[in-house]
């Protein structure tokens, strides 16, 4: 059975089209045979043709639902409705090897790159640890079972959709500061997951913040340097190799003074 890949493509302004189409330049390196579905979201004028052509070149199905969504809402909806395992994939990912048939031991239900807790510059929050959604494998059936089990532990569970609560971005004020649960962080804290092994991590890189660099640049001390890295990768995707080491150093420098649970 072919693996499934879902991509949410957002182009808020024409200047971000490179970040929105980068993944398609190496997508079939990462997923040679997978069934790829791309959902359009918030397309700036003039960007539709570029996205449609990028999808055509890699034989990806382009879906245009006609409404705007948010990344976390989109993920939650997939988890609530899908019946087969799938990959989430961001548009600012570069592949260097195949991600198909990784052969993770045991019975995994969520596999991704571990992102440690760090002090987030843009929101001035403590960004809690999670499995990063830039490239995340999920088994929706097993995850729904895990979430139901987790939710049943409460004597009077609230009448809400637990999956949405755990997947949606959430800000939690505490005496020590605001905790930012980014997309899927609550799910990881509630039911856990599997950290992607090193031999899988070396097969891709992710351009952090590439699709929203314009929004956070005023808060970043090294915004010009980050933008230059992005520019070089758009020029030649192979230059993305090794970016993970720099991101790890960023996390180390901005690690919270206490462990976040």
Outline where the language-model segments fall:
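Short loop->beta transition adjacent to catalytic acidic/histidine clusters or analogous donor-positioning motifs
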Residues: 3-5, 27-38, 60
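Conserved catalytic core of nucleotide-sugar-dependent glycosyltransferases
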Residues: 96-176
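Active-site-proximal specificity loops/subdomain of glycosyltransferases
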Residues: 39-82
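Short, well-formed alpha-helical segments that are part of the catalytic scaffolds
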Residues: 13-29
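Catalytic core and acceptor-binding pocket of nucleotide-sugar-dependent glycosyltransferases
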Residues: 144-232
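Short acidic, S/G/P-rich loop/turn micro-motifs used as interaction or catalytic elements
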Residues: 12-17, 44-45, 93-95, 142-145, ...
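Nucleotide-activated donor-dependent transferases that construct or modify glycoconjugates
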Residues: 2-12
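Short beta-strand-to-loop acidic/aromatic patch adjacent to the donor-nucleotide binding site
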Residues: 84-96
